[in-house]
From Swiss-Prot:
HAMAP family: LacC (MF_01557). GO terms for cellular component: cytosol. Its EC number is 2.7.1.144. Pfam families: PfkB. It is an enzyme of class 2 (transferase). One of its GO terms (molecular function) is phosphofructokinase activity. This is Tagatose-6-phosphate kinase. Belongs to the carbohydrate kinase PfkB family. LacC subfamily. It comes from Streptococcus pyogenes serotype M4 (strain MGAS10750). The gene is lacC. GO terms for biological process: D-tagatose 6-phosphate catabolic process; lactose catabolic process via tagatose-6-phosphate. The keyword Nucleotide-binding applies. It comes from the Bacteria. Pathway: Carbohydrate metabolism; D-tagatose 6-phosphate degradation; D-glyceraldehyde 3-phosphate and glycerone phosphate from D-tagatose 6-phosphate: step 1/2.
Length: 309
């Protein structure tokens, strides 16, 4: 069983446009609305892949009800109700670009935060892996992911963390370490205070920084160029083929789903990295965020090259 945690979920609205025109009216014909934010994308892909998954997070208002009502029935919904309204996030797809407008979301009270913490502990009983994805809602301290990871570690659960900014820094500087982190180059550059490129030797050097000590897996997304990964003391480069991209929204979350599945099934390094990248690519071939077409899985799986470097 895999538990996905989405503390600041959203309704994701996608507007495809041939051209985005500023300071005038843009009319959209094809609008897609889905339960969104990173963790909900993760749980949907895990469900498509056939994993047993339950989803939790903080939801409220009619938007929160929309999320529960529009998740597949095969996903176990174990959300914690709050008084504020769940947010809406808009992605405008135009001219090969993606422009996002993201609401901040509700403000949580101390009582609601404590309530979710107890709720989280209860959900761990039958879980092997926990994914923690996305931003923290207003009111939650920067070290809240650190707190949840500590609880999961005490209960013997593997954790996959996909966040950025102060929340990620708090985890890296804290005592409780996740099993996996998945920064991209931009997030890695922010953490280290210097611009990082796809230079493998430079990546090998920085991933051995004491900042990352105690983290079993560091999987750095290189976008269309695949992944650079560190597992304990071993480094890998993952080459992926060129594909036709319909929408890249949620592809990183699909990669997290593959990582979690690999951990839950005790797969070896190459199998885990291959699965993670295939799921990320499959999502990019779909219009719907957080969805994969398993009919294409085997063909893409055979095209991935994982090399120790």
């Amino acid at each position: 069983m895999i538990l996905t945690v989405t503390l600041n979920p959203a309704i994701d609205v996608s507007y495809p446009l041939d051209e985005l025109k500023c300071d005038t009216v843009n009319r959209v014909v094809d609008v897609t609305k889905t339960p969104g934010d990173k963790g909900l994308n993760v749980c949907r892909v895990l469900n498509d892949f056939g994993e047993t998954v339950k989803a939790t997070g903080c939801i409220g208002g009619e938007s929160g009800d929309f999320i529960i009502n529009h998740l597949p029935d095969s996903i176990l919904s174990r959300f914690y109700k709050i008084s504020g309204d769940t947010r809406t996030c808009i992605a405008i797809l135009h001219e090969g670009n993606q422009t996002e407008i993201l609401e901040k979301g509700p403000l949580l009270s101390v009582e609601e935060i404590d309530g979710f913490t107890h709720h989280f502990k209860y959900l761990l009983n039958d879980v092997d892996v926990v994914t923690l994805s996305g931003s923290l809602p207003a009111g939650m301290p920067d070290d809240y992911y650190q707190k949840l990871i500590g609880i999961a570690n005490l209960n013997g659960k593997k954790t996959v963390l996909d966040c950025s900014g102060n929340a990620l820094e708090a985890v890296l500087k804290g005592d409780s370490k996740p099993t996996v982190i998945k920064p991209n180059l931009e997030e890695l550059s922010q953490l280290l205070g210097k611009e990082m490129t796809k230079d493998f030797e430079a990546l090998k050097e920085v991933l051995q920084d004491e900042l990352f000590e105690g983290i079993e897996w560091i999987i750095v997304s290189l976008g269309a160029d695949g992944v650079f990964a560190k597992h304990n003391d071993t480094f890998y480069n993952v080459d992926i083929p060129k594909i036709e991209i319909v929408s890249a929204v949620g592809s990183g979350d699909s990669t997290v789903a593959g990582i979690a599945s690999g951990l839950a099934n005790d797969e070896d390094d190459r199998a885990l990295l291959t699965k993670a990248n295939v799921l990320g690519m499959l999502n990019a071939q779909e219009k719907t965020t957080g969805h994969v077409n398993m009919a294409n899985y085997d063909k893409l799986y055979q095209s991935i090259k994982v090399k120790e470097v």
